[in-house]
Every structure is written in C-alpha cells, then in structure tokens.
C-alpha cells in the first residue's frame, strides 16, 4: 500500500472519489478519535456515539462524490455528523452524555512535562462545565473553534449559519462559560474540605472573557 500519510485530507478525498479505499482508511484514522469525542458530547451512551461515528463515515464514503475541496474535509465530515445527531435526537431525545475521552489538549500552555496529567484532567473538567452550562449549539461552536480549530467560516458552514451569527454565539458562549467558571471558583473558595478543581482557573477565565491563554 502506498504511503498516504503525507497527503492532505483534500488530496485523499480526491483519491476516494476515484475509488481508493486505502485513502478513505487514512481519513478515518485521522478523524475517528476527534469525531468520536465530538459525538460523545451529544449521544446518550458511548455505544450511541460509536454508532453515530460509524454511520458518519459510512455516509461520507457513500457521498464522497458530493465533496468539494473548496471546504475542508473536516468541515464536510462534521456537517454529516451533526445532521445525523439531529436525527438521533428526534428519535431518542437527549439524556446523559457518555464520558469525554481525555486526550491530549490542542491548546495547552505547559511549564514542565510533570504538569501534563493534571492539566489534561483539568482540560476535560473544563469541557464538562461547558457542556453543563451551554446550550447545544453554543457548545458546538466553542468545541469546533477550540477543539477542532475550525475557522469561523467553516463553523458557519457546519451550522448553516452566517459568520456574523457564529461570532456572536462564540462571544456569548465564552462569556457564559467565564461566569460559570467564576462561580465554581467562588464555591470552592468557601470550602476547605475539597481540593480546587481548576488550579489554572485564572487562565481559563481569561480565555472565556476573550483572552488567549487557555487550555481549550
């Protein structure tokens, strides 16, 4: 099998359109973990997230001829995934989420390698607060921006929204998350019996209010 690791997503997608299963397998390897974590924020059970991820890739393969490289492959893939989750909600409703798999953070400021574990756990805890605090679409905007690093234009494509509305949602989501984190800090400061859940809270609040130093 030829080495496909140096190909871009878009180059691989073009090979898929010519019938290359090897190219599609490479795309699955690149995106399956992050897509699963995205779907874990939406599906009622881990098994449902796994099923949705599988259906997303099946749909992507079946519709690969419709993909246009003007948009990134990730944007196109997340559009399919989000549409499938909407159908899932209509059938089953939304109950408790499956647990987010703690993966290496995308945007983390590390001081020493020893900080990695605690900061990764903190990173997952921050996203749990976001999930509990924000409405579905607001959470999606925040996730796609900071976890998936999609552009405003790409997020707008996934959500079928204007770029202006995405910017407004992002601003409001950051502000609301900042207030939630501040409240968490206030509650913990009143108790001496529990360890502080967010040791880097000041950086996180700075992010949520518009700063750039955050672990999401």
List the predicted regions and their residue ranges:
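Amphipathic alpha-helical segment used for protein-protein interaction
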Residues: 18-21, 93, 110-144, 148-158
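Structural recognition of an alpha-helix C-terminal capping motif at a helix-to-coil junction
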Residues: 51-58, 71-83
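Short, basic/polar amphipathic helix motif occurring as a linker/hinge flanking DNA-binding modules
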Residues: 6, 88-110, 117, 186-190
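Arg/Lys-rich amphipathic alpha helix in sigma70-family domain 2
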Residues: 65-69, 79-99, 119
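Sigma70-family region 2
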Residues: 17-18, 44-45, 55-72, 91-92
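Short, charged helix-capping/linker segments at alpha-helix termini
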Residues: 2-3, 17-26, 36-55, 163, ...
């Amino acid at each position: 099998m030829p080495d496909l690791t140096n190909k871009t997503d878009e180059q691989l997608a073009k090979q898929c359109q010519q019938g290359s299963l090897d190219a599609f397998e490479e795309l699955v390897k690149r995106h399956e973990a992050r897509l699963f974590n995205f779907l874990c924020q939406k599906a009622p059970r881990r098994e449902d997230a796994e099923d949705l991820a599988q259906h997303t890739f099946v749909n992507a393969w079946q519709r690969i001829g419709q993909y246009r490289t003007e948009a990134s492959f990730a944007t196109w893939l997340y559009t399919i995934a989000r549409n499938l989750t909407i159908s899932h909600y209509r059938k089953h409703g939304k109950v408790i989420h499956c647990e987010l798999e703690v993966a290496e953070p995308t945007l983390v400021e590390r001081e020493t390698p020893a900080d990695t574990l605690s900061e990764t756990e903190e990173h997952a805890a921050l996203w749990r607060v976001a999930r509990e605090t924000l409405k579905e679409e607001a959470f999606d905007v925040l996730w796609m921006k900071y976890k998936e690093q999609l552009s405003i234009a790409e997020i707008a494509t996934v959500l079928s929204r204007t770029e202006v509305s995405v910017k407004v949602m992002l601003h409001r989501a950051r502000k609301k998350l900042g207030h939630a984190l501040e409240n968490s800090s206030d509650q913990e400061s009143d108790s001496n019996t529990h360890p502080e859940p967010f040791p880097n809270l000041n950086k996180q609040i700075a992010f949520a209010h518009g700063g750039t130093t955050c672990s999401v």
